[in-house]
From Swiss-Prot:
Family: Belongs to the zinc-containing alcohol dehydrogenase family.
Chemical reaction(s) catalysed: keto-D-fructose + NADH + H(+) = D-sorbitol + NAD(+)
Tissues and organs where the protein is expressed, per its UniProt entry: Expressed in liver.
One of the protein's GO biological processes: fructose metabolic process
Keyword Hydrolase: no
Gene Ontology molecular function: L-iditol 2-dehydrogenase (NAD+) activity; NAD binding; zinc ion binding
N-acetylalanine carried by residues: 2
Protein EC: 1.1.1.-
Cellular component terms per the entry's GO annotation: mitochondrial membrane; motile cilium; protein-containing complex
Alphabetical keyword list: Acetylation, Cell projection, Cilium, Flagellum, Membrane, Metal-binding, Mitochondrion, NAD, Oxidoreductase, Zinc
Enzyme type, top EC level: oxidoreductase
Complex and partners: Homotetramer.
Protein's UniProt name: Sorbitol dehydrogenase
Name of the coding gene: SORD
Length: 355
């Protein structure tokens, strides 16, 4: 198999400046593979880099290819690659450690400060026709798992990591704050891990309906309630305060509601990223021994996710609501910015636009 044609890529130059450009087709190193990209999802972080040119300390200083929720086909392997061959369909884990530091040695490579991560400045992403990546972080997809499911393993991994950090187990009562793509994958995984009841909050009625379809037991459409009122509604629906809360919005009022809602001795996991400084009722959490935990991306999740998808124990296909060919990427980004649908997928292979 050979790379042919142009390497069309979606490139952000600075805040508000998003372009479709042709990039050189890369040559894989000894431990890398060259991929013909198939499906790449648009993440909120991609839109944020486009709109603002930065996320926290990660600043777009040079043109950067976006995209990190991805799958594709191997078309060339480096000399040292033995477990993959041309023609293999793979899902891409976007974070690749650059060194074996203390975090890698303890299995928490996501915390390595020098990690390569697709579409995080200055590292290019994979929203393009052809892309090279570390072979060790490309995972072969079973025939029963589609390319789109392979791309969705990235957001699904956030749910796996968050629910593991939260300690979801058989019989857990769980509150998920926010029903965007990340809130929805947390619903899926919480139920998969044995949660007895899951309640979800959001502003959008349509997204809450999707949450119900994916397994949520109860939903609350937020209007103008105070954080304490939201917490009271959560308790009323569950019949008790939840032992576990997964906050997926990053909005100050939602974090406040999450603290008030969580049962004494319970766990709150902060997944959504908002302003660097927020005002929260920390004393309320402290005196009730509510453990507040963060997560940063994920680690050791791709094999688990592939096994779950191959076994058909979970269904993430309903997350994809819109599809665009790569040539219409700018239209796809505008659609995402307007908040339409749930997950928008870009199809990068002009010869195969199937899921």
């Amino acid at each position: 198999m050979a790379a042919t044609g142009q390497n069309l890529a979606v490139v952000v130059h600075r805040a508000g400046d998003l372009r479709l450009e042709n990039r050189p087709i890369p040559e894989p190193g000894p431990n890398e593979v060259l991929l013909r990209m198939h499906s790449v999802g648009i993440c909120g972080s991609d839109v944020h880099y486009w709109q603002h040119g930065r996320i926290g300390d990660f600043v777009v200083k040079d043109p950067m290819v976006l995209g990190h929720e991805a799958s594709g086909t191997v078309i060339k392997v480096g000399a040292g690659v033995t477990h993959l061959k041309p023609g293999d369909r793979v899902a891409i884990e976007p974070g690749v450690p650059r060194e074996t530091d203390e975090f890698c040695k303890t299995g928490r490579y996501n915390l390595s400060p020098t990690i390569f991560f697709c579409a995080t400045p200055p590292d290019d992403g994979n929203l393009c026709r052809y892309y090279k990546h570390s072979a060790s972080y490309c995972y072969k997809l079973p025939d029963s798992v589609t390319f789109e499911e392979g791309a969705l393993i990235e957001p699904l991994s956030v749910g796996i990591h968050a629910c593991k950090r939260a300690g979801v187990t058989l019989g857990s009562r769980v509150f998920v704050s926010g029903s965007g793509p990340i809130g929805l994958v947390n619903v899926i995984i919480a139920k998969m891990m044995g949660a007895a009841a899951v309640v979800v909050t959001d502003l959008s009625a349509s997204r809450l309906q999707t949450a119900k379809e994916l397994g949520a037991d109860f939903t609350i459409q937020i209007k103008n309630e105070t954080p304490q009122e939201v917490a009271a509604k959560v308790e009323s629906l569950l019949g008790c305060m939840p032992e576990i809360t997964v906050e997926c919005t990053g909005v100050q009022a939602c974090i406040q509601a999450s603290i008030y809602a969580t049962r004494s001795g319970g766990t709150l996991v902060l997944v959504g990223l908002g302003p660097e400084m927020v005002t929260v009722p920390i004393v309320n959490a402290a005196v009730r021994e509510v453990d507040i935990r963060g997560i940063f991306r994920y680690c050791n999740t791709w094999p688990v996710a592939i096994s779950l998808l191959a076994s058909k124990r979970i269904n993430i296909k309903p997350l994809v609501t819109h599809r665009f060919p790569l040539e219409k990427a700018l239209e796809a980004f505008e659609t995402t910015k307007r908040g339409e649908g749930v997950k928008i997928m870009l199809k990068c292979d002009p010869t195969d636009q199937n899921p």
